[in-house]
Regions:
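A conserved hydrophobic secondary-structure block that centers on an alpha-helix together
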Residues: 128-161
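Contiguous, structured surface segment used for ligand recognition
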Residues: 1-122
Length: 245
C-alpha cells in the first residue's frame, strides 16, 4: 500500500484524469497485494501520491517528484497526468503490468525528479489488420502498449486487397464476402513458386466494435486514424461488388 495519505487527486482534475489515477491505484493494489484508495481533495496532503493541477506546464507535459515523503505529480491536463502514470509504472517492478499479486516484489519507487514533455506532436503506430486480422482484444492490447510508450496516433489499416475489416451497413457484402479469403500466401511475394495456406480466413469489426476501440483509445489519449484504401488496393471490395470495377 502507499504510505502516508494514499493516492489523492486535486479536486480540479477532470474525470478522465481521476479515472486514469483510479485505474493505476487499482492495478497497483492488485499486483502488490496492498490497498490504495483514491480520494479527491481541495487541499492536498504532504505525503502519499498526489496529483496536482499546474497550469504552467504544457498540455502533454508533466513534472514527477519522488522523495522520501511521497510522490507529487504535476500536470495541466489529462494527457500530462496520463503520461506521468506511465512513468510511475515503469519505475515499479514489471509485475505491475500483470494480473496476479506479486507480494515478493520490492514495491519501492526510486527518489527522482522528472520534467517531461513530447518533442513531436504526432507519435504514431500503424497496424495492418487487412492482411492479418486482429481481434478487438488484441487491438486493445496494442493500444495498451502504445500508451506505455506515450504514443498518441493509431493508424488503423482496415482495408486492402487481402480483406475488408469494417462494417458498412449500406454495403453488407463488403464484410459478408470481402472480409474472408480461401487461402493466404506464406512468405514474401518475391518467393517463386508462391506458397499458400489453404482455408477460410478473415474477420471484421462491427460498427459497435469500432466505437468501442475508439473509446478505449481515447481513455489512453490516443486518436484513431482509420484507413480505407480506394481506388488502389481494393480487390476485397471489388470481389464483394465486382460491378464497381
Amino acid at each position: 500500500a502507499v504510505k502516508g495519505e494514499g493516492v489523492v487527486c486535486d479536486s480540479r482534475d477532470d474525470e478522465r484524469t481521476q479515472r486514469a489515477v483510479a485505474e493505476f491505484a487499482a492495478q497497483l493494489a492488485k499486483t502488490s497485494g496492498g490497498e490504495n484508495p483514491v480520494t479527491v481533495a481541495d487541499e492536498l496532503p504532504a505525503s502519499g501520491i498526489r496529483f496536482v493541477l499546474d497550469q504552467t506546464l504544457p498540455e502533454e507535459g508533466y513534472r514527477l517528484d519522488v522523495t522520501p515523503k511521497g510522490v507529487e505529480v504535476r500536470a495541466s491536463r489529462f494527457p500530462g497526468f496520463f503520461y506521468a502514470v506511465q512513468s510511475l509504472r515503469q519505475m515499479l517492478p514489471a509485475a505491475v503490468y500483470g494480473t496476479e499479486p506479486a507480494p515478493g516484489e520490492e514495491w519501492v519507487l526510486p527518489c527522482v525528479s522528472i520534467e517531461d514533455a513530447p518533442r513531436f506532436a504526432y507519435r504514431g503506430m500503424h497496424l495492418d489488420v487487412a492482411r492479418h486480422f486482429f481481434s478487438v482484444e488484441e487491438v486493445k492490447r496494442y493500444l495498451d502498449v502504445m500508451a506505455i510508450h506515450k504514443l498518441n496516433r493509431f493508424h488503423w489499416h482496415l482495408t486492402d486487397d487481402q480483406g475488408w475489416r469494417i462494417e458498412i451497413k449500406r454495403y453488407p457484402r463488403l464484410t459478408q464476402v470481402g472480409a474472408w479469403r480461401s487461402k493466404s500466401q506464406i512468405g514474401s511475394y518475391e518467393e517463386k513458386p508462391a506458397t499458400f495456406e489453404f482455408g477460410r480466413y478473415g474477420g471484421f469489426y462491427t460498427q459497435d466494435e469500432i466505437r468501442e476501440v475508439v473509446a478505449y483509445a481515447a481513455e489512453r489519449y490516443i486518436t484513431v486514424i482509420p484507413e480505407i484504401e480506394m481506388p488502389g488496393h481494393s480487390l476485397a471490395a471489388l470481389t464483394a461488388y465486382p460491378w464497381l470495377g
